[in-house]
Amino acid sequence: KDYINYKLTGVHCTDYSDASGMLLLDVQHKCWSKEMLDICGVSEAKMPKLFESWEPVGTLTAEAAAKLGLPEGVKVCAGAGDNAAAAVGCGAVGNGKCNISLGTSGTVFITSSTFGVDKQNALHSFDHADGGYHLMGCILSAASCNKWWMEDILNTQDFGKEQEPITAEKLGANDVYYLPYLMGERSPHNDPAARGSFIGLRMDSTRADMTQAVLEGVAFAIKDCVEIARAQGVEIASSTLCGGGAKSPLWQIGRAS
């Protein structure tokens, strides 16, 4: 988005939500960190201008306006990082809202009106697109676990059919467990060597048991991130779900539980 904004306006800029992930931003005070810039040997003059996500960064250049068929002078706003934008779209703004994204990876995005740092160094402290802050946990394998299990192992793309034998009453009552660390793990373990596995398999275990275990394993990995935040006094008033995994009724129930 920052490159697109540059081509539209000629302004070299970014927003706070995206800049938070660069390790060069003083997230609390919303400015470039002189300490980090000095360590990296980077002059602040070379850094992009910083804007809130809703702030106009400039207007369309004559060239961009002509190519787009729009009038010159149209304002262009900074925009937001992917997870921050998704959170805003799901209503996770203000304080104490949680948006869970189940895509290839999974994120737990908890909004806050004040800046706070995770004392266990397991969650990110970032600026939010609404002008506030948020804690974020990210698991590396979420819906990708289900895709791997269905397409690569079971050789099917009929996800709904495979989940039909799994009723809501069976959730949490399965004796087969799954660790979803197919690509190592980010939050809250920060362990690139972590690996996935099925645990508790018996002679009478079924493919439905294993399918359920995959869904539950991802749900519990998300819960790990939520519990880290709650253990530090972060209150969550409501939560929403987005991403491809949100299409699964079982994951919806698992998230709510």
Question: Which role does the model predict for each range below?
Answer:
Residues C40-E52:
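A conserved helix-loop-beta module that forms one wall/lid of the active-site cleft
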Residues D2-T14, L23-K34, D38-G41, P56, ...:
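Active-site core segments that coordinate phosphate-bearing ligands/cofactors
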Residues D18-A19:
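Glycine-/proline-rich flexible loop or hinge segments
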